Amino acid sequence: MNQTIKAKLELLPDSPGCYLHKDKNGTVIYVGKAKNLKNRVRSYFHGSHNTKTELLVSEIEDLEWIVVGSNIESLVLEINLIQRYKPKYNIMLKDDKYYPFLKITNEKYPRLLVVRKVQKDGATYFGPYPDVKAANEVKRLLDRIFPFRKCGLHEKKVCFYFHIHQCLCPVVNHVDPQVYKDMTQEVKEFLTGSDKKIVKELEGKMISASDNMEFEQAAEYRDVIKAIGTLRTKQRVMNQDLKDRDVFGYYVDKGWMCVQVFFVRQGKLIQRDVNMFPYYNDAEEDFLTYIGQFYQDNNHMMPREIFIPQDIDKDSVEAVVAASQEGNLLTKAQAKAVDAKVFTAKTLKFSDQKDVEQSIVKLDKELSSEKRLSSLLAKTQIIQPSRGEKKQLVNMATKNAQTQLQLKFDVAERDILKTTKAVENLGKILGIPKPVRIESFDNSNIMGTSPVSAMVVFIDGKPSKKDYRKYKIKTVVGADDYASMREVMTRRYSRALKEETALPDLIAMDGGAGQVNIAKEVLRELGLAIPVAGMQKNDKHQTSELLFGDPLEVVPLSRQSQEFFLLTRIQDEVHRFAITFHRQLRGKNTFSSKLDGIVGLGPKRKQKLLTTFKNLKAIEEATVQEVAEAGVPYEVAERVKNTLSAPHKSDENWESIKDNVPLLKSEKS
């Protein structure tokens, strides 16, 4: 805990509000709310916590807070701040799950489409459907019944669907707008569950066609009626009232929360949404935050009813749902409370305070929270069922949340057990104590340019990225893998001895006998007795065998074993890490080398160009004016363009290596 945090902890008020934790870069990494700011914020820095909270606290370098008038106001403000800053430790809903909807467009002659995103475009949406197949099945059925427009608005002749009676082509053929409007209304009624009227009409048409001996047409009507019946049976009816509702259940265990949402449409359970995430506050409060974010997403359409468990505060749910749906999470009442009570210490600067206050002023112009809340709740009811089928639905959602969370833990425990067992078995196979900490090294260079090395660390079979290290080769000229490895290992373990930091239980070299022998020589010179193994690759650049012992021998390992899989992961990871570092360094060197010597272009201006254009090719394609706009004088921009357009001695070498030649052996090793 630094001095800034210590000073601010003494100034915390006893009021409700929101707090923002920041890292060393001033980035907001967590937003929380509290009924009592003093008690909540201080609790982070006192007492014991679980691993996740300890990790969060270890990154906190500064904090801020905003005082509000009530706990509900802090809840709504918290959601607003999370959406604004997107802190890495907060609950953030996944944005990659877009369920399909049927959309009736807001056009003169509407179309029926299957879409994945709900937009505020005046169209009417129905769904969500379990998958695209289900949505397309309903659309195909409706296409057979209603000849909705499928062609564009600028067609000059009828489309293909016109000839098979699935499009009226209203742009080419005159269609009475009222007729089209009535048809659109029938489609909407069908999609809201009122299909009895349509079935009755189809039955009448089928009988009429049969009486007129139009047997093919009668068969078509029969098939459509049958398809409607099949569609009904595919959807499980949960309630006879045919209302749209979302059913929420949640479960918490071991610092994790799982929220399960059932989508019930026209009384049928059609889909569910599952989210699991670590939580740091009170479980009920984090669940409320989840609901607030859930309904901010346009793809989560507001149903007629929302079912929630009995242990959740109903008033809070009503507040966050209302605010989320309006797209404006700070109400007028909140704005006044925040504006009047924002804490600003004279001796401490809050970098985001001005931004927060400006947002509040802007939002203060909106409608009052009371009016917005009553308007929303006139359409949507928040219900806490206490018995019957509705209570069973909430219980089912809660039970499913528990099952999903337990499944996550079971899978994780099996993976941990499997990985730990592989580490233990590897030690037995090599005849050494269990290698809890394994370190691996690899070099990377092209023709001796930008030579680098990298070290990765695996602890209990899992990568420990905080212990990874990158090395620029300092004493070796040209492409000498052995000399580079000697330098890097000497630097690594000399420093470890000097600083008395952790040493590995096993060193796994990316390479064969040559790399292993270099490692052994370095360790011998430093007086270290650490086992060294070599991970040798075949001609396809894949892990093929493990070398160990004195003299080195191939260790018999099944390619299907967990031990072999662990070694492959280590070798792939150290190679990836080294290659990535080398490419980053090579790109910077290439960029600088071509711009070196240009009068008026120093390091700062080079950095401006790199930030704006990312690479040399982008600068070459830019105009002189665009280069100047990146932050360099016009005459310097001209010199840059002239230099890049002239032949450069290293161009052929660099570009042929970078773009036209596959990875060379020295980069693969």
Curated annotation (Swiss-Prot):
Entry-linked NCBIfam families: uvrC
Keywords: Cytoplasm, DNA damage, DNA excision, DNA repair, Excision nuclease, SOS response
Gene Ontology cellular component annotations, sorted alphabetically: cytoplasm; excinuclease repair complex
Region of interest (Disordered), residue spans: 647-669
Name of this chain's protein: UvrABC system protein C
Segments forming domain GIY-YIG: 14-91
Residues covered by the UVR domain: 196-231
Role this protein plays: The UvrABC repair system catalyzes the recognition and processing of DNA lesions. UvrC both incises the 5' and 3' sides of the lesion. The N-terminal half is responsible for the 3' incision and the C-terminal half is responsible for the 5' incision.
Basic and acidic residues composition bias: residue spans: 648-658
GO terms (BP aspect): nucleotide-excision repair; SOS response
PANTHER family linked to this entry: UVRABC SYSTEM PROTEIN C, UVRC/OXIDOREDUCTASE
Single GO molecular function: excinuclease ABC activity
Species of provenance: Lactococcus lactis subsp. cremoris (strain MG1363)
Classification via Gene3D superfamilies: 5' to 3' exonuclease, C-terminal subdomain, GIY-YIG endonuclease, UVR domain, UvrC, RNAse H endonuclease domain
InterPro entries in UniProt: GIY-YIG_endonuc, GIY-YIG_endonuc_sf, GIY-YIG_UvrC_Cho, RuvA_2-like, UVR_dom, UVR_dom_sf, UvrABC_protein_C, UvrC
Family of this protein: Belongs to the UvrC family.
Cytoplasm found in the keyword field: yes
Compartment(s) where it occurs, according to its Swiss-Prot or TrEMBL record: Cytoplasm
Disulfide bonds: none
Main location group: cytoplasm
Self-association state and partner proteins as the record states: Interacts with UvrB in an incision complex.
